[in-house]
Swiss-Prot record:
Belongs to the ATP-dependent AMP-binding enzyme family. Pfam families: AMP-binding, AMP-binding_C, PP-binding. It is found in: Cell membrane. The keyword Transmembrane applies. The gene is posA. This is Delta-poly-L-ornithine synthetase. GO terms for cellular component: cytoplasm; plasma membrane. L-ornithine binds at D217, E221, T304, V312, S313. It comes from Acinetobacter baumannii (strain AB307-0294).
Length: 1332
């Protein structure tokens, strides 16, 4: 029997190895290793080590002491010591004495220790001198590890134990309220060690990490498998066990080769640990995403499964990428099968209860014959004496056709909380022991997205006093570990039961948590602030007692939306308008919130500086508007000429019998390159001329200076600056615009409003999509100011710097940080968050190598490399349009051959022909971009690279390929095709993942888990460039995690499963994040609870049918190709028209016709989108809709067309003009008089209301929808009169910004939040703006 044996009814067995069944005990195994390898290091703890010989001799002395105190084979000895060498020495001593150890975790309550010792009839307990007093109530004899190590005058002989005697006892949660002890014999454990290691293959040369508590039986894999082969155990300190990032580094430093861990811990490691030879996982389910990340060629990654009752593990699987994660097949000499409730054997593929048999199955529970008879039953399918006992695990499972076992969760009332097995009955029994409680039932159910223990309590009929929840918590915390204390207690008259008499847990899970509470239980408010607070809380929580020490989240059940509502209601009272949502999260308790209400706030920016609005000059407004109206057609025409000129060239030189298509293509590319070069020259020249003589200051809105600035700003947008991002050419371009740029400056990408007022000194590093906003409009004025970045300063990605700001030498501004106007960041300081605050002093430069030198020759060479590369890339991505032309022409001549009679027919005809041509162009572009990236950068590894080195150059080239391709493929984002596109680029993307407009992506470094969601404008894992070096780290997003709009995810982030990162927020340190958490803000703030999403069926959210996938695929396919088809169709119409004009008149007249055609094209693009919006959607209303529904597809389609057709071709040129509000009204926006809009970023137009004289600066706007849990939620945004919204500020739906309010840069107004009138706010989340 050397192979797996599987019969047709689901009985599978591991390989048969009789040599693993030896007549031995653990003491024999250790003694053999100690004799064979006496000088080999056995244990390492910090700077202490013990060899196997030393450990054996020292443990032997302790064992002899125990023998002198009467300890014999068969006895039980408790073990309660801090982790370390002394603990393992005591464990071995008990083993050598012939007794069995009963281990306890360091944090186990003394009452529970006493219960277990009494139940096990332990003869004594080993502990420390310090802990001795905690066991005063324990009747058993207690020995300290110090006294057991005193020298002996003479040697003491030790009695020999037998294989059938106990080796150790592990206590787990018991369903009757009493913990149950599982006795593992010497035979059980010795067989297990040899069986499992025959597959794991731990060797003498290995260095094994020891991190588990000895009360958790996975620790025996760490300890005793090492003892079996003579490996070295490295004992982790307690502080390291809970710090995954530091642990990861320590594993590398200590060159650990074997890691036994739970999957949750491994998932939190920020990077690979190459020296790990074996990774053995167990204790909980292992997600596929973890396998994708860690199942690498240099690791052997195993998944083990087994209850304590079968000795640590019973099955094992070598995990490989691309294979489903299972618990594998039985270990050698073990067997598994699946039965139904009638204990009948089930066929392959059928789900039932998993059962285990073999020589390592325990004999039962200590002193619990009834429970033993229920769980350990006779095995009718046994083939030997060793298989006669069958253990019923209580886990649901099935066995597939390959003999792999799939574990599907618990079948009984046992649950897992944070990795701990918990019998609900034990909690219920502890509750029933409390006076006044008649019956109790405990269930596990999700509340606000988090699994929580809910206790339902029926009081005794003749109870003398009411049940006090606080007293209940205190009582239980004395008897149970913290993870077993229920999160919530519900008082009910009677616990529902089934006909069988058992508790009806299904009814409890469905029962609303709305028990009525007597208001007399509430505290009485003692001052006006408390009266107002209690009145609002009573409205929000109508059935809850309100006490001053009640926690808003834990006791009252508050969540994110209720937090916003509470603060908004309090702000309606002028004296409390300074309160913030952040205050609530920090204070939490009702009394602490009331105390904050009484604090005197600091004077805000509004109070001190900008309380008065300035009247707008209507004459200036209309004169400026007329001037803008004259220039806009020219701007649109210049923009359209960039693609229409080569389009025209191609068609002008084709069509005749002697025309050469290759010649036409070459000439078109030459024209395309010329247009690109000319656009840079034009934008530089015109901007320098327009801004001549304009300096820092305040200028009237709509005045002459404003018009000159507006026109210069608009014309600078015509050149494709994205081609220069991250290169030294960008510095050259900014210099040409008037900026003062020093030597060896690195700029990834910036948005600069006034280059002539920008100074960047030597060695400065600037991240991606940084806003240098030294121009803004507020209160009827254009405000211009300088920005000065001094030597070696640093600005992180997505940061915003306002006018008149200075960063001193080596000042460090973190990502997603706002530096408000008139701010100086001192030398060497690190500022973070919005509003920015000092968080430390820079020492990062000391960690980096010396800045690589940039010689003059290399600088010139880089100019050449970046310039030629940029033009080559631009041409490569223009080339796919020519096959589309050929296809259109071929379809025109060979398939349709129709001669339209007018311009509208021509446009429609060529638009239809262009649809398949556009699809082909998209596919060619996708293939070219993914292929070129792999050629340019075949392999990219984690590390640090010089920005003036080959890796950076190649990485830049690959990044530019991606950036340039997105000019064509932008429509792929937020569609069903986006994950495939990211996979083509090299990212690891799980099933059913949604990806919107993610930026900064390094595909090779990105892993997205299954069913994760990346929202709009997320900066996702971009590289950090600082001090002349580029750092690359892997970024991982866990399964079902959500990253909100405009969030910043730093490279190296490892986001656990089911985590939500809020809008315009960033993540905390990896070690602070755990499954199921919600973080928002900058800096990140942990949200205790968030608003529960409306429930929809799975087929509308996460698990759609094939039909819905096909329908969405079709609609989104059209949405991708239609913008390009529209451009090609209109392009044909314009080209044919202009060729006709040139042939009949002259080139000058043709250029005029081309300009007019460009204007009509821009207006037409807007009108088409507006028409489609009203036909397909009608008027937007507040609502929610699951993702896999027609409304969402159509709405997202309209948004995509608006962003890809209407904005770039028309509305962008209306930003900052009096005309933009008019066109937004056509789309449905309710917008007042004299509104200034430097943004067109609005989606659900009808849900936006903007008051008179409001001012929206660039990249700001209302956000009327969010996706959470695959549900699109739409709400109203109301902005009052005379409101100022600064750069990159977002107002979420159901929020209200009252009259005369000011929102600073990078500010987030939360859902349901109300910003009071005549106040100034800044930050994410918003806080009163106190300018310092």
């Amino acid at each position: 029997m050397n192979q797996f044996v599987t019969n047709t009814k689901n009985v599978i067995r591991g390989k048969y190895h009789p040599e693993f069944l030896q007549n031995e005990v653990l003491a024999d195994i250790f003694a053999h290793t100690a004799q064979t390898l006496p000088d080999k290091t056995a244990l390492i703890e910090a700077d202490k080590t013990l060899s196997y010989g030393e450990l054996y001799q020292q443990a032997l002395i302790m064992a002899q002491h125990l023998a002198l105190k009467g300890v014999k084979p068969g006895h039980i000895v408790g073990l309660w010591l801090p982790r370390g060498i002394e603990l393992l020495k005591a464990q071995l001593a008990i083993c050598l004495s012939g007794a069995a150890w009963l281990p306890f975790d360091m944090d186990t309550p003394a009452d529970r220790i006493a219960v277990c010792l009494e139940d096990a009839e332990a003869v004594g307990m080993i502990t420390t001198d310090e802990w001795y007093e905690h066991l005063a109530e324990v009747p058993q004899t207690k020995w300290t590890n110090t006294e057991l190590q005193k020298p002996l005058s003479e040697s003491v002989s030790l009695a020999k134990t037998t294989p059938d005697q106990p080796a150790y006892i592990i206590y787990t949660s018991g369903s009757t309220g009493k913990p149950k002890g599982i006795v593992i014999t010497q035979k059980n454990i010795c067989h297990f060690l040899r069986s499992e290691n025959s597959i794991l293959g731990i060797q003498e040369q290995d260095k094994v990490y020891q991190g588990f508590s000895v009360a958790f039986d996975m620790s025996f894999e760490e300890i005793w498998l090492s003892y079996l082969v003579g490996a070295t155990l490295w004992i982790a300190p307690k502080s390291l066990v809970s710090d995954p990032e530091r642990l990861c580094q320590t594993l590398k430093q200590e060159q650990i080769t074997v890691l036994h861990a739970v999957p949750t811990l491994l998932a939190l490691f920020p990077e690979d640990v190459p020296n790990l030879r074996i990774i053995n996982l167990g204790g909980e389910m292992c997600p596929d995403s973890l396998v994708d990340r860690w199942a690498l060629p240099h690791h052997q990654m195993f998944n083990t499964y087994g209850p304590t009752e079968t000795t640590v593990s019973a099955s094992l699987e070598l995990l490989e990428r691309g294979k489903p994660v299972t618990i594998g097949k039985p270990l050698p000499n073990y067997g598994m099968l699946v039965i139904n409730s009638e204990r009948e054997l089930l066929e392959q593929g059928e789900t039932g209860e998993l059962c285990i048999f073999g020589p390592s199955v325990a004999q039962g529970y200590l002193g619990r014959p009834d429970l033993t008879a229920d769980k350990f039953i006779e095995n009718p399918w046994a083939m030997s004496v060793e298989e006669e006992l069958l253990y019923r695990t209580g886990d649901l499972a099935k066995i597939d056709e390959f003999g792999q076992v799939h574990c599907l969760g618990r079948a009984d009332d046992q649950v897992k909380i944070r990795g701990f097995r918990v019998e609900l009955g034990e909690i219920e029994a502890a509750l029933c022991d409390i006076d006044g409680i008649g019956t109790a039932a405990v269930i596990l159910r999700p509340e606000d997205g988090i699994d929580q223990l809910i206790a339902f309590i029926a009081p005794e009929i003749d109870a003398k006093q009411a049940i006090e929840i606080k007293e209940l918590r205190h009582n239980l915390s004395q008897r149970l570990p913290p993870y077993m204390v229920p999160n919530r207690f519900e008082i009910i008259e009677e616990v529902p039961r089934l006909l069988s008499g058992k508790i009806d847990r299904k009814a409890l899970k469905a029962r609303p948590l709305t028990s009525v509470v007597d208001r007399s239980e509430s505290d009485q408010p003692q001052n006006p602030a408390e009266e107002i607070l209690f009145e609002i809380l009573n409205r929000l929580f109508p059935n809850m007692p309100i006490k001053l020490d009640s926690d808003f989240f834990d006791d009252l059940g508050g969540h994110s939306l209720l937090a916003a509502v509470l603060i908004s209601n309090l702000r309606e009272h002028a004296e409390y308008s300074h309160l913030t949502i952040q205050n609530l999260y920090q204070a939490r308790r009702v009394g602490a919130i009331a105390a904050l209400m009484l604090e005197q706030p600091e004077p805000t920016l509004f109070d001190s500086q900008i309380g008065q609005d300035n009247p707008r000059n209507q004459t200036y407004k209309w004169l400026c508007g007329i001037a803008q109206l004259v220039t806009i057609p020219v701007l649109i025409s210049i923009n359209i000429l960039q693609w229409l000129a080569p389009f025209f060239t191609y068609h002008y030189f084709t069509g005749g019998t002697r025309d050469s298509i290759p010649y036409a293509i070459a000439l078109s590319l030459l024209v395309y390159v010329s247009v690109i070069m000319s656009s840079f020259v034009l934008s530089i020249t015109v901007k320098r001329l327009l801004m001549l003589g304009i300096g820092a200051g305040r200028y009237p809105l709509w005045g002459l200076t404003y018009f000159r600035w507006w026109l210069a700003d608009r014309i600078s947008n015509i050149s494709p600056v994205y081609l220069l991002s991250g290169s030294t050419l960008l510095n050259l371009y900014l210099k040409a615009l008037g900026a003062k740029i020093g030597h060896d400056v690195t700029i990834s990408s910036v948005h600069i409003r006034m280059p002539s007022l920008l100074t960047i000194e030597d060695g400065v590093s600037i991240g991606s999509q940084v806003n240098l906003e030294n121009a803004k409009v507020e209160h009827g004025h254009l405000v211009l100011g300088s920005i000065h970045l001094k030597q070696d300063s640093y600005v992180g990605s997505y940061a915003v710097l306002e006018e008149n700001t200075v960063l001193e030498k080596q000042a460090h501004v973190n990502a997603l940080t706002s530096i408000e106007y008139d701010t100086v960041v001192p030398e060497g300081e690190i500022w973070d968050g919005t509003p920015a605050q000092k968080i430390g002093h820079i020492d990062e430069q000391a960690k980096l190598p010396e800045r690589p030198k940039l010689s003059f020759i290399r600088k010139i060479a880089e100019y050449g490399y970046y310039g030629v590369s940029a033009l080559i890339i631009a041409c490569l991505f223009f080339i796919p349009i020519f096959p589309s032309f050929l296809l259109v022409d071929w379809l025109d001549v060979n398939v349709f051959n129709i001669n339209p009679n007018n311009h509208l027919q021509i446009a429609l005809y060529y638009f239809i022909l262009a649809i398949p041509a556009s699809a082909m162009m998209m596919m060619i572009t996708a293939v070219i971009s993914s292929g070129l990236r792999k050629i340019a950068l075949p392999r990219l590894e984690i590390g640090t690279y010089a920005v003036h080195g080959s890796t950076y150059y190649r990485k830049w080239f690959a990044a530019q390929i991606l950036e340039t391709s997105l000019q064509t493929l932008h429509g792929l984002f937020a569609t069903i095709y986006a994950p495939t596109w990211f996979r083509m680029l090299g990212a690891k993307v799980g099933k059913n993942t949604e990806i919107s407009t993610a930026t900064g992506v390094i595909p090779e470094m990105l892993t997205l888990g299954e069913e994760s969601f990346i929202a709009d404008a997320v900066m996702l894992g971009d590289e950090e460039i600082k001090g002349g070096w580029m750092s690359l780290k892997a970024t991982k997003i866990g399964n079902r995690s959500f990253v909100g709009n405009s969030a910043y995810i730093a490279d190296g982030t490892v986001l656990p499963d089911n985590v939500l990162i809020g809008v315009q927020s960033k993540t905390p340190d990896n070690r602070e994040m755990y499954d199921g958490q919600t973080w928002f803000g900058s800096p990140a703030l942990l949200l205790p609870a968030r608003e529960a999403a409306e429930k929809y069926p799975d087929h509308l959210t996460f698990k759609p049918s094939i039909k819905r996938r096909l329908m969405r695929g079709f609609i989104e396919g059209l949405r991708i190709v239609l913008p390009a088809a529209l451009a090609i169709g209109v392009g044909y119409m314009i080209v044919l028209d202009v060729i006709d004009v040139i042939n009949n008149y002259n080139i000058e007249t043709g250029l005029v016709a081309l300009t007019l055609a460009g204007l009509l094209y821009g207006v037409g693009c807007f009108l088409i989108v507006a028409l489609l919006k009203w036909i397909l959607i009608g008027r937007y209303q507040p609502r929610s809709a699951p993702m896999w529904t027609m409304f969402v597809w159509l709405s997202e389609g309209i948004t995509s067309l608006y962003e890809s057709v209407a904005i770039p071709n028309f509305l962008n040129y209306l930003r900052g003009t009096p005309m933009l509000p008019f066109f937004l009204r056509i789309l449905g926006v309710r917008i007042g008089k004299d509104v200034y809009m430097d943004t067109a970023d609005i989606t659900e137009f009808d849900c936006v209301s903007i008051g008179d004289r409001a001012e929206f600066n660039s990249f700001s706007g209302p956000q009327t929808h969010l996706f959470e849990d695959r549900i699109m939620k739409i709400g109203q945004v109301n902005v009052g009169n005379d409101v100022v919204v600064n750069t990159r500020s977002i107002i979420l739906y159901n929020a209200n910004v009252s009259n005369h309010a000011v929102l600073g840069p990078l500010t987030l107004v939360m859902k349901g939040e109300n910003i009071p009138a005549k106040s100034a706010w800044i930050g994410s989340p918003a806080v009163p703006w106190v300018h310092k």
